[in-house]
Amino acid sequence: MVTKTSSGVDLAEIGIFSELSKRELKAVSRLMTELTIKEGATLTRQGEPGREFMIISSGTAKVEIDGQTVAHLAPGEFLGELAVISGTPRTATVTATSPMIIEILNRREFMALLD
């Protein structure tokens, strides 16, 4: 049973999905959409509403809070879960530092998975 996204990320290895069954992981993989992102593109902006949960398949990004870089993200890491789950504004700005492939799950589908 396939538990990987179209770009090859094994969802079972992503912490937020680690407790899901193979059947549930397969359902998640079918809901995800792959996007190609250019270097310098903004994935999220601090203070804006969050509508998507994202997993990095390839490439890197930097995380900034109030203009200060606080982290770097690499393949297999995810972002956007806090704003999607809580409905609060994005807590950070995330910018691609290289070309990227990301997998996206929108808020409605993400919340349906949690029910």
Where are these regions (language model features)?
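Cytosolic regulatory regions built on CNB/CRP/Popeye-like sensor folds
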Residues: 1-115
